[in-house]
């Protein structure tokens, strides 16, 4: 899909667009079993779209068909007329809340010196500008292939005719060996401790897996699907060449925590999920290669070089040392701005440190990264809570700008009867207290340590947080741990890898069950969960089928402890509202790419990003917003506006 990415960037000043909603390629790649094709406007000689337009907004221009946007009224007549289904009508926001609908199609990158970007960037050279003579030749070649009974190269069958003109990338794809996974500790071994379960790649493994990358263009689809737009094919090429220092330096241009994201990112939903090889021999193991180069380089003493950075004299207060705050601080310090990071916890990382269990993320990595950030010039004020130990008024008075990356710490409730009873725990306090226990830190009254050894534990929920709770309880030595989820396994929001790991470690799963009430014993302590069985009904607004209770299907599952993992809401920050920062109906901070300066709030000196803005989401989306907000802060300090790509 390098052609799609190239097309979008060619129409956006060679920059990635800032939101998925703006990713509107004028060429579409279709992948289906036995078929791969790119579809776009054919610039027909007697174009039906031209004839259908009631306002003369589409016209022949030489050998191409062009849309005159100033005349387009968004009527969709061209969409109906196009026999190839390649016309779109897109809606773009205008001033004062207005929108404009206009036709959107391939324009052959009119005015672009190098010609169509899709042709230039296709790694397999499968796209070309064709005249009549070329089309006749291609038709002859197709007829010849049909006569020879050839199949597509990626189907790995041996054709009856030779393929002297097959592209190098197609041959490379056909010869690519299967994906290799990192070694993993045996389930019985890993259940006995909280150490990371995945072993790092050896240099040989890293080389073998890097060699599988097809290098799909300068800006590949894996780069686009990564919220940070990491230069993935480029640093994989450097790994192939054995240049780890250059690879890690390149990865740090877009990501200040590559050793973290390599471990905890859901690559299967992002970069690896988009990999061209995914459906053939398995996606390139991007996350493990990222982890390898970071671990190798940092262990050997590599550090970011900021020797050429000149201090600007500006200072920015950052509230929250989680992914958003750290990414913001990293970008600011690289531009000569002094970031001072305030956090209520004794270590940086936010939920990276205290929410993600140590068996997924070794906590020593955050301590090392704090030392690196400090060497770069970032100052940390830990065990310091805004609104308690320091006021927002002080920050606004003493700093040139403030960034809020406070995350989301308030657990969602299901509204079940007896959910406040003894033995019922919210997921996040349970995980935070456990991590503090592992790190040798004292528990707090708000987050008391809970040991589930010998207990029958039921975890309600189906996301990664639920899996973290399940696997933590198993490591405590719980007698039995069951995860109960209201939909089927295919609809679980959590990572398939995490579900697989939990099963290997002994977790039980109960699908299509909806909790009705929490049962109590004579002492008022939880002793079970009453469920109704469900079946999947009509889709909800998000397209997922709703679980519908089955009448008369009630049953009680015994439980000594119940952990509720339904997700998180933004927690209340009265000091934020007092400063004049507008919130939405769900308590999230109103800020985004459409702000005057990226991620500026209703209070001009305050910027925000991450989960406090978008709700609970991924580490990389929080980091991406932290970086966007840093750009907004830099522009605000310089009083200039960055184009809204």
Residue ranges and their predicted role:
Residues 1-11, 33-56, 66-85, 100-121, ...:
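Cysteine-centered iron-sulfur cluster-binding motifs in ferredoxin-type domains/subunits
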Residues 13-51, 69-71, 76-173, 178-188, ...:
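Flanking helices and flexible, charged tails adjoining ferredoxin-like Fe-S electron-transfer domains
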Residues 176-183, 187-199, 229-241, 251-252, ...:
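Beta1-alpha1 glycine-rich phosphate/pyrophosphate-binding loop at the start
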Residues 235, 259-263, 269-319, 335, ...:
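FAD-binding core/adjacent interface of flavoenzyme oxidoreductases
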Residues 246, 310, 315-319, 367-416, ...:
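Feature captures the FAD/FMN-dependent oxidoreductase FAD-binding
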Residues 320-323, 462-463, 611:
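Glycine-rich Rossmann-fold phosphate-binding loop(s) that bind the pyrophosphate
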Residues 420-454, 539-616:
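FAD-site-proximal beta/loop scaffold in flavoenzymes
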Residues 469, 612-637:
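A conserved FAD-binding loop/helix module that cradles the flavin
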């Amino acid at each position: 899909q390098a052609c799609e990415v190239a097309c979008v960037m060619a129409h956006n000043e060679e920059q990635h667009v800032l939101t998925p909603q703006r990713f509107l390629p004028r060429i579409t790649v279709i992948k289906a079993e036995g078929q791969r094709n790119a579809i776009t406007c054919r610039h027909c000689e007697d174009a039906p779209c031209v004839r259908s337009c009631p306002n003369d907004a589409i016209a022949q221009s030489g050998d191409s068909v062009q849309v005159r946007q100033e005349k387009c009224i968004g009527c969709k007549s061209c969409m109906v007329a196009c026999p190839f289904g390649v016309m779109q009508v897109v809606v773009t926001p205008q001033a004062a809340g207005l929108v404009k609908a206009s036709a959107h199609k391939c324009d052959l990158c009119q005015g672009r010196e190098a010609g169509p970007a899709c042709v230039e960037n296709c790694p397999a050279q499968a796209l070309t500008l064709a005249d009549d003579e070329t089309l006749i030749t291609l038709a002859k070649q197709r007829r010849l292939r049909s006569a020879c009974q050839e199949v597509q190269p990626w189907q790995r069958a041996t054709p009856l005719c030779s393929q002297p003109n097959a592209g190098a990338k197609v041959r490379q794809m056909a010869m690519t060996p299967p994906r290799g996974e990192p070694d993993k500790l045996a389930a019985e071994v890993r259940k006995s401790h909280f150490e990371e379960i995945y072993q790092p790649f050896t240099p040989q493994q890293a080389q073998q897996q890097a060699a599988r990358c097809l290098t799909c263009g300068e800006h590949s689809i894996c780069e686009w699907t990564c919220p940070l737009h990491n230069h993935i094919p480029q640093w994989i090429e450097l790994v192939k060449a054995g240049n780890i220092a250059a690879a890690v330096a390149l990865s740090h241009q877009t990501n200040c925590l590559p050793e973290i994201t390599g471990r905890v990112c859901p690559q299967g939903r992002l970069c690896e999920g988009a990999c061209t090889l995914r459906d053939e021999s398995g996606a390139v193991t991007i996350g493990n290669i990222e982890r390898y180069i970071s671990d190798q380089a940092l262990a050997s003493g590599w550090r970011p070089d900021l020797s050429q950075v000149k201090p600007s004299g500006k200072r920015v207060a950052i509230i929250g040392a989680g992914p958003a705050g750290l990414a913001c601080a990293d970008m600011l310090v690289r531009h000569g701005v002094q970031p001072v990071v305030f956090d209520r916890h004794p270590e940086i990382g936010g939920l990276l440190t205290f929410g993600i269990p140590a068996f997924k993320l070794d906590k020593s990595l955050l301590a090392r990264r704090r030392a690196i950030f400090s060497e770069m010039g970032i100052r940390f004020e830990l065990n310091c809570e805004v609104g308690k130990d320091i006021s927002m008024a002080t920050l606004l008075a003493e700093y040139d700008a403030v960034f809020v990356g406070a995350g989301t710490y308030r657990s969602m409730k299901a509204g079940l009867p007896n959910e406040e009873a003894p033995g019922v725990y919210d997921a996040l306090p349970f995980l935070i207290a456990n991590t503090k226990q592992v790190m040798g830190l004292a528990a707090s009254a708000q987050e008391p340590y809970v040991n589930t050894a010998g207990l029958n534990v039921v975890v309600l929920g189906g996301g990664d947080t639920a899996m973290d709770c399940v696997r933590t309880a198993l490591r405590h030595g719980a007698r039995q741990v069951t995860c109960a989820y209201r939909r089927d396994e295919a609809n679980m929001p959590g990572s398939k890898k995490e579900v697989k790991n939990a099963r290997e470690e002994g977790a039980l799963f109960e699908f299509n069950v909806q909790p009705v009430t929490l049962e109590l014993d004579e002492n008022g302590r939880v002793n079970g969960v009453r469920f109704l069985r469900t079946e999947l009904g009509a889709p909800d607004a998000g397209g997922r089928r709703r679980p519908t209770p089955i009448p008369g299907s009630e049953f009680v599952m015994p439980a000594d402890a119940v952990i509720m993992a339904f997700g998180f809401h933004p927690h209340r920050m009265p000091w934020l509202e007092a400063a004049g920062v507008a919130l939405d109906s769900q308590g999230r901070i109103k800020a985004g790419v459409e702000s005057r300066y990226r991620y500026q709030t209703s209070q001009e000196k305050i910027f925000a990003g991450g989960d406090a803005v978008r709700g609970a989401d991924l580490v990389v989306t929080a980091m991406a917003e932290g970086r966007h907000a840093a750009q907004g802060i830099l522009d605000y300090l310089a009083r200039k506006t960055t184009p809204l790509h």
